[in-house]
Amino acid sequence: MPRRDRIKPSFEDDESFENEFDYRYKRGKEQTSLNSDNENSESGSGSEQEEHENEHDVDDEMASISFGALNRAQARLKQEQLRRSQRDYESDSDSDSAPEETSSSSQPTNKKRSKHAPAVSSTKKPVSRIRDIPGLPSRKSQTLHSDIRFDAAYGKADLNQARKNYAFLDEYRKQEIANMESILKDKKSKLNESEKEEIRLQLQSLKSRMDSLKNRDLENLILKEYKKKQYQNVKEGKSSQPHFLKRSDKRKILQKAKFDSMKPKQRERAMERKRKKRLGKEFRQLEFRPLN
């Protein structure tokens, strides 16, 4: 059967279709509808022959479609399938879960957040049973070092009372100092130089700690005696009200009491350290600085 010549229509003039594929697709549908009408009116043998010819016509029409139109049609079909599958998935999830109300807070807004607004946390992170409150110690620090004697909830720590309660530790410190000195003096000891040096450092640290504790005890004793004397004067009528020391006066009284309690060699050593400190300060003030 000879192939019939066809004239392609100009799609630019046809405003009812977007592209060539829509035109071809609609024309094929019209041909199939005409064939179905002819089948009802004509006999079986004639209708089969015409149907066969019409199928060939539709195939020829589809074969003449350009590749660009086919690509666009394929992309549109993929988008439609994706949209349909997403719609089915959303309908399934909505049927399984309870209906939720859409709130305006879920929608993102460009409004600036207030600093007093509640904090936003992730829903993926499990909520702890004990929540951390800003401004208070964290739960981890409390579990690491928890000692009710030094808890802030019981008020400020009283160093004087703690010193009285643990005064018996001085005996252990003195005994430890004596043991270290005996080890260092023992010439038959099998310790190497590094171990001896470590013991010397520990001994020096322990002695300095004992000296600082003694100085603190002496300061507390002097201030306590001064307060007691002032209240005694008020009680006897020698003064109308007690005199409270300023920081500079307190420093002078403590320094005088320390020098009085020192031995002559200790006093000379302290005076020498003080003189060197003052001399170094004067040299730093008078040192030569080159002009730029």
Curated annotation (Swiss-Prot):
Residues 173-217 form a coiled coil. Residues 21-30, 77-90, 257-271, 280-292 have a biased composition (Basic and acidic residues). Residues 35-47 have a biased composition (Low complexity). Transmembrane segments: none annotated. GO terms for cellular component: 90S preribosome; nucleolus; small-subunit processome. Keywords: Coiled coil, Nucleus, Ribonucleoprotein, Ribosome biogenesis, rRNA processing. One of its GO terms (biological process) is maturation of SSU-rRNA from tricistronic rRNA transcript (SSU-rRNA, 5.8S rRNA, LSU-rRNA). Its main location: nucleus. Residues 1-145, 255-292 are annotated as: Disordered. It is found in: Nucleus, Nucleolus. Residues 48-62 have a biased composition (Acidic residues). Belongs to the RRP36 family. Associates with 90S and pre-40S pre-ribosomal particles. Component of the 90S pre-ribosome involved in the maturation of rRNAs. Required for early cleavages of the pre-RNAs in the 40S ribosomal subunit maturation pathway. This is rRNA biogenesis protein RRP36. It comes from Lodderomyces elongisporus (strain ATCC 11503 / CBS 2605 / JCM 1781 / NBRC 1676 / NRRL YB-4239) (Yeast).
